[in-house]
Amino acid sequence: MAVAVPPGRAAGSGWAWRPVARDALLARAFHSCTELRGRFYLVGGLLAGGAREPSSDTVVFDPARGQAVRLGARGSPPRSHHDAAPVDGRWLCVVGGWDGSRRLATVTALDTERGVWEAWTGTPGDCPPAGLSSHTCTRISDRELQVAGREGGIHTQRRYGSIYTLRLDPSARTYCYKQEGCHTASRSGHCAALLQTPGPHPGHQLLLFGGCNLAEPEVAGHWSHGKIKEEPPVAPHLMEQLARLVSSGQGSQKGPHGLRHHSCSVVGPFAVLFGGETLTRARDTICNDLYIYDTRTSPPLWFHFPCADRGMKRMGHRTCLWNDQLYLVGGFGEDGRTASPQVCILDFI
């Protein structure tokens, strides 16, 4: 178990990744991992570092039983560096990514009731990105996603990031991209967090972290009170534990500099980031640090909790929130080539 207790701190102010399952089916990186009806759906990814061809399989992990099975649904798309989101509690929509030959902006959906993959089609008014990989898709309603990332094909990449609203219609099996009027910094391998804004004028904002040589988060969208209908998972115990951990640390207004291919999960007022690859070093680039972005204060504060266990270095992994626990799934380890078959939960000591 990877344990990290800050020097001079007592028990109760440390954290650990505690292994709860291990299966070779889960060993992958740059995959998507999406919770839907109490199951984690892992789609695609790279099975080894340096691989050019992404996996085309879908693995379902049952966190209650600690068991993984390969889904037999036909038509599972080969994808890596994509993102995915649940829709209407039934469909798993995979957006963009690398298929082994090009970057895509298409939507492919798994009907979890019928066990069938479907290629959805763009509507006549659709204005899709040129191509997406290492982007983010954030639910802002049950049928709307906010897509953020750098567009481009194999040979050309934009010098800025684009923001799209992606509307999904499961009954018609269609989707429609609408480009928003603003741009962001050129980011790839970043993460996104939809967080409530405190203060006298509450609302929501979408923040982008990392994916470029910057430390500051960037606002990619802002909604006034009542506009966002998306209800985040309730995790009161985990939120309490994170608050206790933060109270043992020293906050800073500066976040991690030049981090990419890390994970991010929103737990109440906290964005919890882990691992990733740093752009600030030529060697030993894969990280095992825990960062917590606390929005309860104004301005929000960063808290950094290092980990001494090099075996927990990860990049291209995912974290997933379920049943008041934060799960860590997959990713390449310290060598940047070997995918982890472990599932861990964030524990506190």
Swiss-Prot record:
Family annotation (InterPro entries): Gal_Oxase/kelch_b-propeller, Kelch-typ_b-propeller, KLDC9
Signal sequence coordinates: none
Key words of the record: Kelch repeat, Repeat
Molecular-function GO term, any one: cyclin binding
Pfam families: Kelch_KLHDC2_KLHL20_DRC7
Keyword set includes Metal-binding: no
Domain of life the protein comes from: Eukaryota
Kelch repeat residues: 39-89, 91-137, 325-349
Summary of subunit composition and partner proteins: Interacts with CCNA1.
Name of this protein: Kelch domain-containing protein 9
Native species: Homo sapiens
Phylogenetic classification of the source organism: Eukaryota, Metazoa, Chordata, Craniata, Vertebrata
Gene that encodes it: KLHDC9
